From Swiss-Prot:
This is UAP56-interacting factor. The lineage of its organism: Eukaryota, Metazoa, Chordata, Craniata, Vertebrata. It holds the Pfam family FYTT. It comes from Rattus norvegicus (Rat). One of its GO terms (cellular component) is nucleoplasm. Its main location: nucleus. Interacts with DDX39B/UAP56 and NXF1; interaction with DDX39B/UAP56 and NXF1 are mutually exclusive. Interacts with SSRP1; required for its recruitment to mRNAs. Interacts with CHTOP. Required for mRNA export from the nucleus to the cytoplasm. Acts as an adapter that uses the DDX39B/UAP56-NFX1 pathway to ensure efficient mRNA export and delivering to the nuclear pore. Associates with spliced and unspliced mRNAs simultaneously with ALYREF/THOC4. The modification Phosphoserine is found at S23, S60, S117. Residues 1-23 are annotated as: Disordered. It is found in: Nucleus, Nucleoplasm; Nucleus speckle. The gene is Fyttd1. There is a cross-link at K260 (Glycyl lysine isopeptide (Lys-Gly) (interchain with G-Cter in SUMO2)). The keyword Ubl conjugation applies.
Amino acid sequence: MNRFGTRLVGATATTPPAPKARSNENLDKIDMSLDEIIKLNRKEGKKQSFPRLNRRLQQSGARQLRMRVRWGVQQSSGFGKTSVSRRGRVLPGKRRPYGVITGLAARKATGIRKGISPMNRPPLSDKNIERYFPALKRKTSLLRQNEVQRKPVAVLKRPNQLNRKNNIPANFTRSGNKLSHQKDTRQATFLFRRGLKVQTQLNTEQLIDDVVAKRTRQWRTSTTNGGILTVSIDNPGAVQCPVTQKPRLTRTAVPSFLTKREQSDVKKIPKGVPLQFDINSVGKQTGMTLNERFGILKEQRAALPFSKGGSRFVTVG
């Protein structure tokens, strides 16, 4: 044992000072038991793993504050509080606080940060926009302010338009009393196809009151019609007043010297008597009387031989 020790000492005499300390440690380990050597190795391993952490903890307070402000990490002072690194990870060797979010709650929290999936997305209301998308809310508010600034000042209406009590809307014929109008048109077409002239007169005052008063839907309106339907039937016996209308001149008037002068101003009366019968029946007439005609027919019937079943004609004697 002494020889081996003297050899090691002689060998380490020529080596630099750093390995000398290691050789002394090795000599101590030889004298130690196995359990002591394992404990010593564990201590040395821990010392080698923590120098980097100790260096970080020895940084100046100003530099730590600058880094925290830069990466958006809140300053936490006091013993036992967790410190967060640049990438958001908890540094080793620090005690975690109570009430750590784990499981489904942690997934929800990360989902809020990263973005919500379309399956679990909440309805897009003002509260949810403020909660999940604050930046978007700020942008929309700024856009609204710009729109309000750009919007021109509304021009005031004329006083006579404002003071009117019964302002008829522009789409009055479309919206108001649409069903009654359709009913009138159907009735008019039905009568017109049977040769009857139809004229509809709508009571405009009643229609205006209906539009102002009634705010109900179209299918709830009453079936009573405010219009008056008048039917005029052609009566040839009635005296019709002649309507004097000036003829339109499609071309320039012909000069007086070119027009033919009429020989007499008196109208020519046509000769003859007006016919009271069909003119086509004149050619069918003959000089034979009715008695002669019926006598010929009787003779023809008598000449025909009687059939077995008897005669179909009956002779009146």
